[in-house]
Each structure stands twice: as C-alpha cells, then as structure tokens.
C-alpha cells in the first residue's frame, strides 16, 4: 500500500471467538497489513506530524517513550524511509538499548537519549536534551509520547473511512487515548466506541479522552478490567487465549493491547453485553514486534 493511503483500501476480516456460539458478528480492520514496522494506528497518528516536518522543512523529529515503545519503533522506521533525522528520549537506563525494540530504532538511525523514570517527565531534564540538539542542528519538531495530540488525533480519525460507519460498535485497545479519541470524532455518535485500557489504574485516561472529544457525543466507554496486572503484563490465561485466538482466526495479535481487548470482548459477549444482531468492528493496531520484546524479557 502507498504511504498514507486511504484507509478504505484496508481489508476487513470476519473473526470468531471459539467459546462464543451465539453472539454478534465480529470483524477486524487489518491496519497491521499497511506495513510491518509503521503500520497499525501509528502511521495515522504520525501522518500530520510528518506532513508538518516536510512542508515546513524542519530539520528533525524528536519524541518520547518507554524502552519497548511501539510509537518510537514506528517513528524510527518511518523516518528512515523518508530520510528524516529522528531522536528518542527513552524512559530508562543505558543497558535497555540492548533490547530488540531499541536495537531496531538505533539501526534505523534514531539517536537515543535515556532519562531515568524519576526524571523522564521532568520538563527541565527533557529541555536540556532538546536544547543541545537544537544548538547543533536547528529547530526540531517534537511529538508527545504515544503521538497523542491534536495532529495525532486528526490522523487517527482517518483509521475509518466514511463507508465503514455502519457498525454498531467500534473497539480498540487504549494506551495514551489518542486513537480512541480519533474514533470517537470520526463516528460522531454513529455507533458506540469501546476502549480497553492496557494500563492498571488507567482511569485518568477518561479525563484525557473527554478533553479531546468534548464537542462530540458521549457515545463511548472505556473498560478497565482487562489490564492483567498492568501495561505489558501477561499471565497464562491471557497467553493461552492469545494462542487460541490466533490459531482460530489465522492472524497475529499483539500481546500488549489487542490480546487484552479481544479477551475483554469475549468476556463481555459471554455476559450478554451485545445483541446477537450487533455488528462489531475491531481495529487491529499492529505492534506485532512487541512479541519480540516479550521473548527478550523472558530470557533475562
């Protein structure tokens, strides 16, 4: 597919939950097929940031994330393709650069700076790094962690095309709140948007989503019961579910967001949350390289 091509060209696949015999019709929009590195929701959230950099001839891009950040991974790959210098400020310590996620970022040309968790959110510490870079190369474009801001949400609203606004529910995993905010804006009350937080104690996300969608109908709900202990946490139940789902539907899902969302959807269906007549569209947000991160950590 062409870079930043219309989301109307992306396949929608029917899926099944093995334990559900009588339930709604489930479909998944395969954003993961756009590209193995910067596909999924990431390319949409980065679209207008990239456009700004290219149109205004800004020298480079800088963003933030954890050592296994999907966002930094996608940004590094996209900047490599487009020939844009990029920088990442990473929450953690120097030894983290050996993990497969950051190894890819470094090989793709991203220059990495580490800030300890204690100082990662410090504007003072971040600005020290940013000022040093700008002294050397001039103005840079800064993207917030996860790519969630007005430009990111505008791009995320394009994950759905106009002719896909005929579903009863739209479902997505939630980390920073940008992608679900884009869905809420796009659907604009046509169907309900269901988000599944991948974070423990992620209730604060509701305030953020509300602020981004205050001019749109409150036709959404964020579930907090399927985080499995917190961000990037798994247990045997979730791992078994992931393997069974992948085998039954001939597609891969990521272990951070989609496995939890899909587990939640199956559980809600068992609890009769949906009508048998409902049509449910799930957004596949990519991020499959997270499997490598889990394998890496399992060996540590």
Language model features: what each stretch is:
Residues 1-300:
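PLP-dependent amino-acid enzyme catalytic core
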